[in-house]
Amino acid sequence: MAHLINFFKSKFSREKYENELEMVKNEDNPKRLSYIARHNVFPKVRLEAVSRISDESVLADIAKNDSNKNVRRAAIEKISDVSVLTDISRNDSNSSVRVMANNRLMDLGYE
């Protein structure tokens, strides 16, 4: 019985993920994209939302606060604010995120 429950639970989650990912790909409203990027439970959905956001303040918030390092890294790639990147390069809990922020600073001509 437990296997059957897990099967349906897994199928529901997969369908929910696929629906939400498709929704983000078709979303044009910056406020909705910002909300999705900050609050969706699926990291890949948040990644897709981040890829469609250009507001640096939203990206900075995500780069500093998202629970998933890959989402933070995606936001960093789009940030040009030196103070935000410096803060992340010094303080992020993940070394690969710190390195990426430092590399982004170098790409922008800061060392």
Regions found by a protein language model. Give the residues of each.
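Alpha-helical scaffold segments
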Residues: M1-E111
